[in-house]
Amino acid sequence: MGESIMEQVEAIIAPVITEQGLELVDVEYVKEGAHWYLRIYIDKEGGVDIDDCTNVSHLVSEVLDKHDPIAQAYMLEVSSPGLERPLKKDEDFERFTGKLVRVLTKEAYQGYKEFTGYLVGLIEDDIVLEYEKEKMAIPRAIVDKANLTFEF
């Protein structure tokens, strides 16, 4: 056993999403008020549209009903990751090199828990950002979240 609900869900739905020519960006399972929500974020080159989200919602719903990894009732939501999409996989950090990102850490690092800068990339086990011509390497092990940041 040992797998978390999220790991089970990702393993079940990733092939379905990939078969549609889409990327599984993130999965969230959260309780808001009295209701549980399973949120699936998908993307593709050029972005996703409502038809992509509707199609994935139907396909994912079928496969999750078949495997039933979540015991309680939940609402399924499928959407684009938005402008401030999360960066999780190595490929995300490669793809968005040069973009403005925000990194939150689980613990203070060099006196801070929040960093914003242009993504230089991954170097070994560090996320490297550049801010005001200074480079900073943040250990990936202490990163809580990394997201693209919208530039005005």
Curated annotation (Swiss-Prot):
The keyword tRNA processing does not apply. GO terms for cellular component: cytosol. SUPFAM superfamilies: YhbC-like, C-terminal domain, YhbC-like, N-terminal domain. It is found in: Cytoplasm. Its main location: cytoplasm. GO terms for biological process: ribosomal small subunit assembly; translation. InterPro entries: Ribosome_maturation_RimP (IPR003728), RimP_C (IPR028998), RimP_C_sf (IPR036847), RimP_N (IPR028989), RimP_N_sf (IPR035956). Keywords: Cytoplasm, Ribosome biogenesis. NCBIfam families: PRK00092.1-2 (NF000928). HAMAP family: RimP. Belongs to the RimP family. Required for maturation of 30S ribosomal subunits. PANTHER family: RIBOSOME MATURATION FACTOR RIMP. This is Ribosome maturation factor RimP. It comes from Desulfitobacterium hafniense (strain Y51). The gene is rimP.
